[in-house]
Amino acid sequence: MEIGENKILETNDFDIAKSKQYHLSLRIGIDNFSFSILDTVTLSYNYLVVNYFTYISIKDTVKKITSIIKNNNLFQLNFSSSSLIYSGFPNTLLPKELENSTNEKKLLEFNDDKCYEKIYFDIIDNIKIIYSIPETVDNITKTFFPTCKTMSEEKIFLEKKIYRDLSTCV
């Protein structure tokens, strides 16, 4: 693997001509943007880019992420699939039974003093994860990655925890 100045890892097997057999995974946070490329045939990660930056404002974060996307030709490729994780944004958990009786925005504000304009949720078994992201960050997703499957980072953590607990019970 070759390591570059911008925290880039690339295997010798990486070939942009094979983009149709690759899955693009993205992660957007308040102070970071990273992505990796998985070869769905060999099930190996062939490319990884990690960008951390000092948080100044949402506007500045969006500007930095947009610049990274626009200046990387990999985002012009056609991938077999793509997914995006929102990381570190305000979130809370709610039992699924209560989902229709509660104002999601008020719940988020109760749990975290920040609540952004866009409110989304993920469901895992009987748990509802409610999270919010800034509208400008949401616009990045819709503009550059309109077909991306999106979810909160907490969903992945909880799924792994639930799966691990279930596998130890068997």
What are these regions (language model features)?
Residues 20-31, 64-66, 70, 110-119:
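Short N-terminal helix-initiation segments at or just after the protein's N-terminus
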Residues 31, 40, 56, 87-89:
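Generic structural motif
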Residues 48-53, 70-71, 75-166:
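Active-site neighborhood for divalent-cation/phosphate handling
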Residues 2-45, 160-170:
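Gly/Thr-rich phosphate-binding beta-strand-loop-beta motif of the actin/hexokinase/Hsp70
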Residues 2-6, 13-16, 60-65, 107-110, ...:
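A short linear-motif detector with a strong N-terminal bias
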Residues 46-68:
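Nucleic-acid-processing active sites and adjacent nucleic-acid-binding tracks
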